[in-house]
Amino acid sequence: MINRKNTYKSKSNNETDDKKAKSALQHCSRNNGVRTPGPAVLTALRKPAAFALLICIGATAILGCSGGESLAPVKPERAAEQTDSPVPNPTQVLSGDYIPPVQTPLPLPADEPNPFETELQFNNENFARAFKYKYGSICVSDRSSIAELHLRRCGLMYIDDLTKFGYLRVLDLSENMIYDLSPIEKLTALRKLNLDTNNISDISHLSELTELLELDIDKNNISNLYPLTPLKNMTKLLAHENEIHDLQPLSELTKLQKLGLRSNSISDLRPLSKLVELRELYLHDNSISDISPLSELHELRRLNLHDNVLSDISELRSLENMERLWIYNNSISDISALAGMKELSVLYAGMNSIEDISSLAELVNLTDVSLHNNAITDVSALEEHVNLKKLDLSGNPLDDSAVEVLCTLTGLEKLDLQRTGISQEGIAAIRAALPKANVLA
């Protein structure tokens, strides 16, 4: 017997399901252009699994209506409507739009400080103290901005690892007690290095600093200059007061313009003959007797040879660009080689055996001349040298015949005539003629 009640109930449920499915698809039809299904489709969708799938598709379609992509093709007339609709303001947030979260970096934990904001640390306590005294506290992030370090007279015996300062161009460690230069060898970007007045004897760690332009190693215990041979870009080298005697390592440093070798044990100047760009050369207080290798250094402007064992300076004749020359305290008697130095302004030639100064007659640019303690009796070569500011003739056997010439030097500011044979009357006449000059007698 057929249960009509159950059949009716089943039919009623099917009709209800048909209405729900049809309603869902009509909603999608209004929003996405999906066609309303026929009875066959509705019959297939009466099964629970199919109906659940339909609900998922409907939900996706509804989300697509709100801002996503449509699940079904859009009718031509609907596409036209969408094309004609005004484009919303891109800054305007529409209801239902998906807004991505703002990507922000995660903060560091409170117990983990930013490594770039921590204070720069040094291994050597004494170095750290000197650095902090000069520069205060420096963060790790600031080290790349440090191009110069000036740690002069800080009582340093050791240098800390300075490789952390990769951009360092200038380093001044003068007047300390440093003897080990190994921490410097990796500072290959250095342009200027001052190691004046330390306890250095070994400079082998400097051989890698090929970009170095200026080096000061004055007042140390250095005897071997061979580690400097690779430093071919150097233009300035100061090595006063060391134990240097061999200059051969310098022969290849042809870009040198200033070279200081005062107070060493130098006697042979031949390696310097190739340094044709030299403009300043300081060789005083050595054991030099032969200066012929200097004859090719035509660019020389300043040359200091005082306190050596020179007797012949004829090789200086070709150095016509000379501006300042120091040759005092030697055994020189002839200065005729100076006649062609038209640019000479400073001449210190005291404590020699000079009698004749006629070679100075044409050197009208002279401003400062010292000829003390020689054997000069005639100063007529200096007549009307109005550019002279300072003149030292002390310790020469002059007499009153020099008074007339000296009265013509109206530009003088200081005149030393002590220990000469000029009378008091002659001194008085000179003072009257040169009221602006300080005349010592």
Segments (PLM) and residue ranges:
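Leucine-rich repeat
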Residues: 143, 164-168, 184-190, 206-212, ...
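N-terminal capping/linker segments that flank leucine-rich repeat
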Residues: 65-166, 170, 183, 227, ...
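Conserved hydrophobic beta-strand positions in leucine-rich repeat
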Residues: 147-149, 171-173, 193-195, 213-217, ...
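Ankyrin-repeat and related helical/solenoid repeat scaffolds used for protein-protein interactions
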Residues: 365-422
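Gram-positive cell-envelope targeting signals
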Residues: 1-83
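Thr-biased low-complexity repeat/linker tracts and other Thr-enriched repetitive architectures
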Residues: 257, 265-267, 274-276, 287-289, ...
